[in-house]
């Protein structure tokens, strides 16, 4: 079963890099941009640097390490020739078709499963790898959301806190690199703060990541919320979680639980470090969440935990993991 990508932007390209490195065949890429530009942006990346292979193109194909990948520019998802290309799993990474009613058009085009690389509406299931991936049922789940990068950073930490100590309620702030949903210079935007120049401001804004965590950890429903501060960095973010627990704890107890999870059931998803790191140290880190143990604080039953994440590369790795899970379980 082959994979297709709709939307070859920041996430689509990084997911492609990872799938290519894992030997997963991407048979078709659909994007409204011309092939010359798609090939150039795959070959050269301001954050992740040169693609580790050969990239070429013509009017109909991209060529990666000599392998031809069909490239189309179709606006209507149901008209994309997924079936013709042998694509069973579509990665929907345009950011446009996040409503299941729109995303299911890929199924009409011949795909069997759609993985949305964003929080979705009306999806069959939201999956955060390492947290609730075992709930995936190929007979029932066809439109799948991989949640957001921030939900993927929060959920593993909250899972540990909830299971080890119990969470009464919690708030979070993600200090998050700017994204395409901001303005380079002051320009109109429906969010007046996001309308301001991204590269010179700290921009308070909303995030649904905390509430969305309850989709994969239902016990937290109504007890976890938060906000975002967008900052002038190109990738890399850090979640600041403050939780009231069901018993008093020490920072050492909390760190021990997080470290045990990182070395055990959440290995590869959650990382743990006692090094005094900064943002550039976690760029291109494949984990969903990297606990910065020296920043953990406890006061009675209140605890503060900081977790870094590369909001592009870490998230793209989880999309790739989810693709492999779907392929492994069958469509």
Swiss-Prot record:
Catalyzes the oxidative phosphorylation of glyceraldehyde 3-phosphate (G3P) to 1,3-bisphosphoglycerate (BPG) using the cofactor NAD. The first reaction step involves the formation of a hemiacetal intermediate between G3P and a cysteine residue, and this hemiacetal intermediate is then oxidized to a thioester, with concomitant reduction of NAD to NADH. The reduced NADH is then exchanged with the second NAD, and the thioester is attacked by a nucleophilic inorganic phosphate to produce BPG. The keyword Cytoplasm applies. Its main location: cytoplasm. Keywords: Cytoplasm, Glycolysis, NAD, Nucleotide-binding, Oxidoreductase. Its EC number is 1.2.1.12. Belongs to the glyceraldehyde-3-phosphate dehydrogenase family. Thermostable. It catalyses: D-glyceraldehyde 3-phosphate + phosphate + NAD(+) = (2R)-3-phospho-glyceroyl phosphate + NADH + H(+). SMART domains: Gp_dh_N. This is Glyceraldehyde-3-phosphate dehydrogenase. GO terms for molecular function: glyceraldehyde-3-phosphate dehydrogenase (NAD+) (phosphorylating) activity; NAD binding; NADP binding. NCBIfam families: GAPDH-I (TIGR01534). It is found in: Cytoplasm. NAD(+) binds at residues 10-11, 31, 75, 117, 180, 311. The active site is at 149 (nucleophile).
């Amino acid at each position: 079963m082959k994979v297709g990508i709709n939307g070859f932007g920041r996430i689509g390209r990084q997911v492609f890099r990872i799938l290519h490195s894992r030997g997963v065949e991407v048979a078709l890429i659909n994007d409204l941009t011309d092939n010359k530009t798609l090939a150039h942006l795959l070959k050269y990346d301001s954050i992740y640097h040169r693609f580790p292979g050969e990239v070429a193109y013509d009017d109909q194909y991209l060529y990666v390490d000599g392998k031809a990948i069909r490239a189309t520019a179709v606006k209507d998802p149901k008209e994309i020739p997924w079936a013709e290309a042998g694509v069973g799993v579509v990665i929907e990474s345009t950011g446009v078709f996040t409503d299941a009613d729109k995303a299911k058009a890929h199924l009409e085009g011949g795909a069997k499963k759609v993985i949305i690389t964003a929080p979705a509406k009306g999806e069959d299931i939201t999956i955060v790898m390492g947290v609730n991936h075992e709930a995936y049922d190929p007979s029932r789940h066809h439109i799948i959301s991989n949640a957001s990068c921030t939900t993927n950073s929060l959920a593993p930490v909250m899972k540990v806190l909830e299971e080890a100590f119990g969470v009464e309620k919690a708030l979070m702030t993600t200090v998050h690199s700017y994204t395409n949903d901001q303005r380079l210079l002051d320009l109109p935007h429906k969010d007046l703060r996001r309308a301001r120049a991204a590269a010179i401001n700290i921009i308070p804004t909303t995030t649904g990541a905390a509430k969305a965590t309850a989709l994969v950890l239902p016990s937290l429903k109504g007890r976890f919320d938060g906000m975002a501060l967008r900052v002038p960095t190109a990738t890399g973010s850090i979640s600041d979680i403050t939780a009231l627990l069901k018993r008093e704890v020490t920072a050492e107890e909390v760190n021990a639980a997080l470290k045990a999870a990182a070395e055990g059931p959440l290995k590869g998803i959650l990382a743990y470090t006692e090094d005094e790191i900064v943002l550039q140290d976690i760029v291109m880190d494949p984990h969903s969440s990297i606990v910065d143990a020296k920043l953990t604080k406890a006061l009675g039953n209140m605890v503060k935990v900081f977790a870094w994440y590369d909001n592009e590369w870490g998230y793209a790795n989880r999309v790739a993991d989810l693709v492999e899970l779907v392929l492994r379980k069958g469509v």
